């Protein structure tokens, strides 16, 4: 029973699987709302839609629901969290200030200058927009991969992408083709589920087009794998 205890803030970090499955997040927020309450700021790091967080803010009235988008990958995530250089917190203003003070006191590279506060729906939309931008960048360089081949360039594509990324406005992140997983297009846990959900709630023709184009790029992976396997079988048969 936590009802008699006072918490400065509570942080929630649970998975929200593809399909905007917020079952676990709802369960956790419901229990915190019931058993902790006390108008406690509850900072959620889980990705979900602006609509979800707007509704959560209104539904769980014994707590103050906040959203702070997470930007970690599975590699070195603890170290990356400890060394993050910016942070966004969305929700009721005084609760945001309390949570930002917690972050500043414990994370050495965060200051009041690089922590940004806003409303909860904006914070949620920022995460989706950034992941869509990164996915779109991957899509662009997958298209450039084919254009580079068709134009008869003497450089390798890796040389080409590094040259393109020499302009600091572009950079080389999310330009490797095939990607780190050896496949075309973008995949992974976050880009896949977040851009799928963004397509569903944004009602944007551009988002739908890029997601569908990425599905085409991902399909090439299987075609190339089959071709490589077929070529290998032919070589083995001729040896």
Positions of predicted regions on the chain:
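Structural/interface elements that position substrates and couple domains in central-metabolism enzymes
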Residues: 1-239
